[in-house]
């Protein structure tokens, strides 16, 4: 039975996109506390500044916003990537690998990835719990350019991952997220909506749950 809050659209290339009804499901709003800022000057090579100016113009953002994005990505993820031995893998390689993955392969990969995630969360956040685990996964997806979102419907939280890697990677993502949530909340019911490119994991965490508040 199809969830009435979900709209599944078929594209011309036969892939499907899941859309949550915006009149019912709202994007998670985090506290908009004004951050304290400082003004600082750095001396950079002229060529580097020219490239930053060009990139900011192409992205239609200010240089200040671009620099903040670069520094934020470094602080949230890049500075830890060497410590956790993170190696970038091109998307098309993952797509090709996914074609021949069996259910047994997915089980083995999930079991291999779980302790790596735990070690990474402890290394990056200083403690391993559900909030820090979710935040680390969100940091990873943002750093790698993978689309993700967190939406709230009353006490229900919808965690959306749009990977575009194919059906088997959707099955992997679904299984991994279920096992992570079950590790911390074994009694909670978890539902998933899955297409070849998107996974939506839904769990009741309460209307005040915020993965960035710890």
Regions found by a protein language model. Name each.
Residues 2-46, 53-57:
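Short Lys/Arg-rich basic patches
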Residues 91-158:
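An N-terminal amphipathic alpha-helical segment
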Residues 51, 61-84, 211-212:
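Short, basic amphipathic alpha-helical segments that act as recognition/interaction helices
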């Amino acid at each position: 039975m199809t969830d009435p809050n979900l709209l599944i659209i078929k594209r011309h290339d036969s892939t499907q996109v899941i859309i949550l009804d915006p009149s019912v499901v709202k994007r998670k709003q985090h506290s908009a506390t004004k951050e304290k800022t400082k003004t600082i000057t750095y001396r950079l090579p002229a060529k580097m500044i020219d490239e930053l100016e060009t990139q900011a113009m192409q992205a239609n953002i200010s240089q200040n916003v671009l620099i903040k994005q670069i520094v934020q990505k470094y602080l949230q993820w890049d500075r830890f990537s060497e410590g956790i031995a993170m190696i970038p893998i091109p998307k098309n390689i993952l797509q090709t690998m996914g074609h021949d993955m069996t259910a047994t392969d997915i089980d083995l990969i999930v079991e291999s990835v779980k302790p790596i995630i735990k070690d990474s969360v402890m290394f990056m956040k200083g403690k391993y719990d559900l909030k820090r685990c979710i935040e680390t996964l969100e940091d990873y997806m943002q750093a790698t350019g993978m689309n993700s979102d967190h939406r709230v419907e009353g006490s229900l939280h919808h965690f959306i991952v749009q990977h575009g890697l194919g059906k088997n990677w959707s099955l992997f993502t679904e299984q991994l997220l279920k096992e992570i949530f079950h590790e911390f909340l074994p009694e909670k019911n978890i539902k998933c909506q899955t297409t070849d490119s998107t996974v939506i994991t839904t769990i009741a965490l309460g209307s005040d749950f915020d993965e960035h508040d710890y």
